[in-house]
Design a protein with these regions (language model features):
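Second-shell loop/turn segments in exported
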Residues: 15-17, 64-75, 98, 113, ...
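Short, flexible, mixed-charge acidic loops at enzyme active sites
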Residues: 48-61
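Hydrophobic-face positions in mid-chain alpha helices that act as interaction patches
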Residues: 125-241
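Short coil/turn linking the two alpha-helices of tandem helical-hairpin repeats
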Residues: 40-47, 97, 117-119
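"A position-specific structural signal for the A-helix of alpha-solenoid helical repeats
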Residues: 24, 31, 38, 103, ...
Length: 245
């Protein structure tokens, strides 16, 4: 549904002009690339494990009639489309920080990730170097790390999806899914806790705590407590600067 709505908006925007419209078009092309990339990673083989003539996904690049039945593209065609959409998006996108919107740096990071899947390491490295050298984002400090996850527009978040108490706050959110007072579906295993104990100086170990879920004790992640204690309200961070490193 998200991809279909995106394509409908993109089709309508093709007849519009202006700087704001160009940025919108850039965001739409970048998001179309991301949607196809996510679908390819779930429903197709990894490029590094098969021939590029193997099956990819059904590409969605235009408004189709209701009785349309698509056929799967090859893996090569799939990744060609992903890279083509990012190439189209980049000159249209803003380089300013835009919380909740994908910008130039977010699209560049997604392209670097796609290049890694294609084992084009030199190209991926070039994109990552540009982001590290020229983008307005900074790595979290140790003091910032623990409290960064329930905040919006943090230094390291290149692209995040906005969630507010009125928009997108759902029980299928990352906060409700992981927290003991929600679904509590992400309790740490004993072997994982043993591994954490080997690294007492790792700040990320502080993101786990013992809690009780319906009478069952467990150790649960504390990343997504939610803004103002609302576990529904967490912005999923799609791209962070640390991933670029």
């Amino acid at each position: 549904n998200s991809l279909a709505r995106l394509i409908n908006v993109l089709a309508a925007a093709e007849n519009l002009e202006g700087a704001d419209v160009d940025i919108l078009k850039g965001e739409l092309y970048a998001m179309r690339a991301l949607y196809h990339f996510d679908l390819a990673r779930v429903f197709a083989k990894l490029p590094s494990t098969t021939d590029m003539n193997d099956l990819g996904i059904v590409l969605s690049t235009e408004v189709y009639p209701t009785d349309y039945i698509g056929t799967r593209a090859t893996l090569q065609q799939t990744y060609d489309q992903i890279l083509k959409d990012i190439e189209t998006a980049l000159p249209l996108l803003s380089k300013d920080k835009q919380t909740g919107h994908i910008n130039y740096w977010g699209a560049l990071a997604i392209r670097a990730r796609a290049y890694l899947y294609l084992e084009k390491n030199k190209e991926a490295l070039a994109d990552c170097k540009e982001i590290i050298a020229s983008s307005p984002y900074k790595l979290y400090t140790r003091d910032e790390y623990i409290g960064a996850w329930d905040k919006e527009g943090t230094n390291e978040a290149i692209f995040e999806i906005l969630v507010t108490p009125n928009y997108n706050a759902q029980r299928n959110s990352i906060g409700y899914f992981t927290h003991a007072s929600g679904y509590g579906e992400c309790a740490a295993t004993e072997s994982f806790l043993e591994e954490l104990a080997k690294h007492p100086g790792d700040i990320s170990t502080e993101l786990f705590a013992k809690e009780t879920d319906n009478g069952y004790d467990g150790t649960y992640p504390q990343k997504y407590k939610g803004r103002d204690g609302q576990i529904y309200v967490n912005n999923p961070k799609v791209v962070r600067l640390s991933e670029v490193y």
